[in-house]
Amino acid sequence: MSELKDCPLQFHDFKSVDHLKVCPRYTAVLARSEDDGIGIEELDTLQLELETLLSSASRRLRVLEAETQILTDWQDKKGDRRFLKLGRDHELGAPPKHGKPKKQKLEGKTGHGPGPGPGRPKSKNVQPKIQEYEFTDDPIDVPRIPKNDAPNRFWASVEPYCADITSEEVRTLEELLKPPEDEAEHYKIPPLGKHYSQRWAQEDLLEEQKDGARAAAVADKKKGLIGPLTELDTKDVDALLKKSEAQHEQPEDGCPFGALTQRLLQALVEENIISPMEDSPIPDMSGKESGADGASTSPRNQNKPFSVPHTKSLESRIKEELIAQGLLESEDRPAEDSEDEVLAELRKRQAELKALSAHNRTKKHDLLRLAKEEVSRQELRQRVRMADNEVMDAFRKIMAARQKKRTPTKKEKDQAWKTLKERESILKLLDG
């Protein structure tokens, strides 16, 4: 009980910080969802509130460290007292040891040696006390308080967003405003190539020609005939390709007229809706003659290609006449193909890219303008800080003069007024 009464601890009552009253912005930010985020205008208030919380936490830590130090000092003082007590006991037990020879001399006449007996128990009693002191004198390991590095890491992460704008960042914005060299490449429309059916037909024909040449070469080797037939002539291949293209260009119905001529004739000729050609009954004829006549007049035979001269010139003349009358557009400005989905999607994305790049360029111009304005404001703020230092120097000089019980000189007063007016003028520029 006496140890508890002598305990020097103060047992401080730690008062917690009321977040709703002291830190309302911090409490509101914690109550938000993650998607809302934090605005730039809230950072200054948040900084003040977080510094308030940090100062409260550091104050509590200092009090706890002081209490821990008091406990350590108290334990050391208790150890010193025990050591002094043991020293006194040791000094009290020492005289019998020094008096042993005298007692032996006085009692030596009897020839008995019980003299040293009374001194032994004292030495035995002293030894355990020394061991006990050595046991209790072990240093107490005070646990180290872990360093709270969270505020430092927080302010280090926020620092890039609150730091002053440098000239390098302004140059970076100016470089971003320059149009890229390959910008025109993104708006080019590649030319339309051959249709896949034509390309595949040519590829199939080439493969067939190669396979045929390879098969002919193998057959000639088997027969032992090695001649000019084993190698495929490139001229023959080109001729076959041109022939296949000409056949491919010819419509399936075998009509020699062009597409424009056919469309014009279809617009001028009325369709027989009552009895179409396909539904008309075909008379049955027997015999060779009737078979020959039926074959010649059969609708199937009408689908066979027939030759009409000057079809290409007729097609071109009709096209020129329709263009001259204004019914067709000139080929110099090709009409858009509404069925080309790839081209429509490409132009749609190009329009979106143009709009987005224009929007980004506008925002970059605004950002560059704001950055230049902020740089000028930073210079004014630097001048304000310098003016503040000059005002504080003048104030210290005046206060030092008053402490020395002398009136400030006219020069000191004029200097103070001059610095104050300069500071006010800079503040007006900064606010304007």
UniProtKB/Swiss-Prot annotation:
Function: Functions as a component of the PCAF complex. The PCAF complex is capable of efficiently acetylating histones in a nucleosomal context. The PCAF complex could be considered as the human version of the yeast SAGA complex. Also known as a coactivator for p53/TP53-dependent transcriptional activation. Component of the ATAC complex, a complex with histone acetyltransferase activity on histones H3 and H4.
Annotated compartments: Nucleus
Disordered: annotated span: 87-127, 272-319
Species this chain originates from: Mus musculus (Mouse)
N6-acetyllysine PTM positions: 418
Biased composition annotated in UniProt, kind: Polar residues: 295-305
PANTHER family, alphabetized: TRANSCRIPTIONAL ADAPTER 3, TRANSCRIPTIONAL ADAPTER 3-RELATED
Protein's UniProt name: Transcriptional adapter 3
GO biological process, alphabetically ordered: chromatin organization; mitotic cell cycle; negative regulation of transcription by RNA polymerase II; positive regulation of DNA-templated transcription; positive regulation of gene expression; regulation of cell cycle; regulation of cell division; regulation of DNA repair
